Design a protein with these regions (language model features):
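Non-catalytic interfacial helical region
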Residues: 1-37, 133-138, 142, 153-161
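Hydrophobic packing residues in well-ordered alpha-helices of helical domains and bundles
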Residues: 2, 68, 121, 144-147
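Small-residue-rich helix-loop
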Residues: 15-121, 158-159
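Generic structural concept
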Residues: 68, 72-75, 125, 129, ...
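Long amphipathic alpha-helical segments
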Residues: 88-90, 141-146
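C-terminal capping/gating helix-and-loop segments adjacent to ligand/active sites or protein-protein/ligand interfaces
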Residues: 108-140
Length: 161
C-alpha cells in the first residue's frame, strides 16, 4: 500500500522536493491513524484538536459508522494497555494481547494510555458500545451525531477522571 501512495505523491508534486504539507494534502489517511490522533488529542487535553480531526473526517468521505468502529477499536486497545500498565506487565505482554509484532506501536499505545485514568478508559469502552448502537436503537440521532456525542462524552470522562 505504501508504494502506490509514494508514486501518487511524487506524480503530483512539481520539482524534486516533497514537503510534509504535500504528504498531508495528497496521501491517503489511514482511519486507524486518525483515530489514534483523536484519542491522543483527548489525552493531551486538546479537545479542540480532537474535534477538528473528527470534523475533517466527517467532511471527507469517511462513514460515521466506520469512524465509530475505528475509535472503538482504539479505545479498547488503550484500555488493554492501561490494564497491562496497572498489572505491571511489560511491552512484550501488551504486544501479545494486541496481536502485534510492532514494539513501537505497543509503546505508543502504552504512552497514550498512561495519560488516561482506568475509569476514563473503562467508561470509554462502555460509551463506544453505547454509541455504536444508539442510532439504530432509537433512530433519534444520525450516525454522525452519535460519533460527535461520543467524542464529547469521552472527552468529559477523560477530563473528570
Amino acid at each position: 500500500r505504501l508504494i502506490p501512495e509514494i508514486a501518487k505523491i511524487c506524480g503530483y508534486v512539481p520539482g524534486e522536493r516533497v514537503t510534509v504539507q504535500d504528504v498531508e494534502k495528497l496521501a491517503h489517511h489511514i482511519p486507524e491513524a486518525d483515530a489514534f490522533q483523536m484519542t491522543e488529542e483527548i489525552a493531551r487535553r486538546n479537545y479542540d484538536g480532537a474535534a477538528a480531526k473528527l470534523a475533517e473526517l466527517l467532511a471527507g468521505d469517511a462513514e460515521p459508522i466506520e469512524i465509530m468502529g475505528v475509535i472503538g477499536w482504539q479505545v479498547r486497545q488503550l484500555y488493554a494497555a492501561k490494564i497491562a500498565e496497572k498489572s505491571g506487565r511489560g511491552t512484550a505482554f501488551l504486544m501479545e494481547v494486541l496481536g502485534t509484532s510492532s514494539e513501537y506501536r505497543a509503546r505508543k499505545l502504552a504512552e497514550t494510555a498512561a495519560k488516561f485514568s482506568l475509569p476514563a478508559l473503562t467508561n470509554g469502552v462502555r460509551l463506544c458500545a453505547e454509541y455504536a448502537m444508539k442510532p439504530r436503537e432509537s433512530g433519534a440521532i444520525t450516525d454522525a451525531e452519535a460519533v460527535k456525542e461520543f467524542l464529547i462524552r469521552f472527552a468529559m470522562e477523560a477530563r473528570r477522571a
